[in-house]
UniProtKB/Swiss-Prot annotation:
Transmembrane segments: none annotated. It holds the Pfam family HSR. This is Component of Sp100-rs. GO terms for cellular component: nucleus. The gene is Csprs. InterPro entries: HSR_dom, Sp110/Sp140/Sp140L-like. Residues 6-121 form the HSR domain. It comes from Mus musculus. It comes from the Eukaryota.
Length: 208
């Protein structure tokens, strides 16, 4: 029977939502296997990382390398590895596929990762944000990494603009007094900007 706080029911609903998420991601994974295999243009470090983390066995790793030595195209070898990942699919498979090392080595994976993120967002929004399940937290970490990279780019652009502005201001302060004096005194003599005149005279001291 359900407890007074309704927690058994909530737990069941959360499990159903997580299962639905995994099913959606698995379906998308099957559709994108060919695209993923085309994006991974070399076996290293992809196959090695799968072997090291026991996503594939040592024997299968050697079989895949033997296929490469027999001049089987790399994309077909990678496709075989993806078929193995499909058999044991969960969210950790996606996190391993789209980890930082693979993103740097195989930049074509970036667009594919975004397609998975877009597919996952509706289901993630319905989940309890305090969920401690490994698959959910790993996926959220993956999404946070992408957002952090965007923030770093924005910060870099802002810093560059600040440096340019400082350089322009510093160069402006090199104006000579003979250029400064006629302008300021001209304003004063014509009763223009009279309130600004004392301040401008003070700024004169800043000039070389």
């Amino acid at each position: 029977m359900e407890g007074s706080n309704g927690s058994p029911r909530m737990s069941t609903e959360q499990e159903n939502t997580e299962m639905h998420l995994i099913e959606c991601m698995l379906k998308h994974f099957k559709i994108q296997k060919v695209a993923i295999s085309n994006a991974i243009r070399s076996t290293f470090p992809f196959l090695e990382s799968l072997r090291d983390r026991e996503f594939i066995t040592g024997k299968m790793y050697e079989d895949l390398l033997d296929s490469c030595r027999s001049l089987v195209p790399v994309d077909k070898v990678i496709y075989r590895a993806l078929e193995e990942l499909e058999k044991k699919f969960d969210m950790t498979v996606l996190c391993k596929l789209f980890n930082e090392v693979n993103m740097e080595k195989y930049p074509d994976l970036n667009l594919l990762r975004r397609s998975f993120e877009c597919g996952a967002k509706p289901a993630l929004k319905t989940m309890n944000s305090s969920s401690e399940h490994c698959n959910i937290s790993d996926w959220l970490r993956l999404e946070a990494t992408l957002k952090a990279s965007v923030y770093m780019v924005a910060f870099s652009i802002t810093t560059s603009l600040t440096i340019v502005i400082i350089a322009i201001v510093s160069q402006s302060l090199q104006l000579r007094k003979e250029c400064f004096n006629p302008f300021v005194y001209g304003l004063h003599n014509r009763d223009l900007q009279s309130k600004l005149y004392p301040w401008l005279c003070c700024q004169k001291k800043l000039l070389p």
